[in-house]
Design a protein with these regions (language model features):
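Flexible, acidic loop-helix segments that line cofactor/substrate-binding pockets
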Residues: 1-17, 45-53
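Conserved C-terminal structural/oligomerization subdomain of aldehyde/semialdehyde dehydrogenase
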Residues: 21-176
Length: 176
């Protein structure tokens, strides 16, 4: 298994190919490799982790969508949680299920992650160059860092009428 080399971060695919010992045409924008299936996800499989370069790994799930969710969770266990993922689907059930189990702060639906994550007037996310990854990624916020995060605020707090809810109201059937 390999590890990320500093001289391969954010370089052209041509330079990346040269570092790996082969050549690609000058007009290519990235290198794509097949990752296979879930059997190729793990710390010992370099292509299943974050690369920070012009290399795209394509993994295929087989059978039910649940298998894709299992693979996604395995990849986040290897590559780190919190940042983002994307789904190209029109199936609202698939999108919802991904949203319920993906340990990420943003999910791009039918849009490129690299542009969508940083915010856009076409997706409602505030523009940023700094993305919070929540406690999944060791951050305090899980949203795009924007102007509101740099503004000092002062809370003026006054006593409120105290209306203590009953245990039944708080815990419902779990209180029995």
């Amino acid at each position: 298994a390999g590890h990320r080399l500093p001289n391969t971060v954010a370089i052209s695919p041509q330079k990346l190919a040269e570092a790996a010992g082969f050549e690609i045409p000058a007009d290519r924008k990235f290198i794509a490799v097949t990752g296979g299936g879930i059997e190729n996800v793990g710390k010992e499989h370099f292509f299943s982790s974050e690369k920070l370069t012009t290399l795209l790994t394509l993994f295929k799930y087989y059978g039910e969508f649940e298998n894709a969710l299992t693979m996604m969770q395995a990849m986040f266990n290897v590559g780190g949680k919190g940042h983002s993922c994307g789904i190209y689907s029109f199936d609202d059930d698939h999108i919802h299920r991904l949203g319920m189990c993906a340990p990420v702060s943003r999910i791009m639906v039918r849009q490129p992650n690299n542009r969508g994550n940083s915010g856009s007037s076409t997706n409602g996310m505030p523009p940023t160059s700094s993305m919070g990854c929540g406690t999944w990624g060791g951050n305090i916020v899980s949203e795009n860092i924007c102007l509101k995060h740099y503004m000092n605020t002062t809370w003026v707090s006054r006593p409120l009428a105290y209306d203590m809810p009953s245990n039944e109201e708080l815990f419902g059937e779990y209180n029995k």
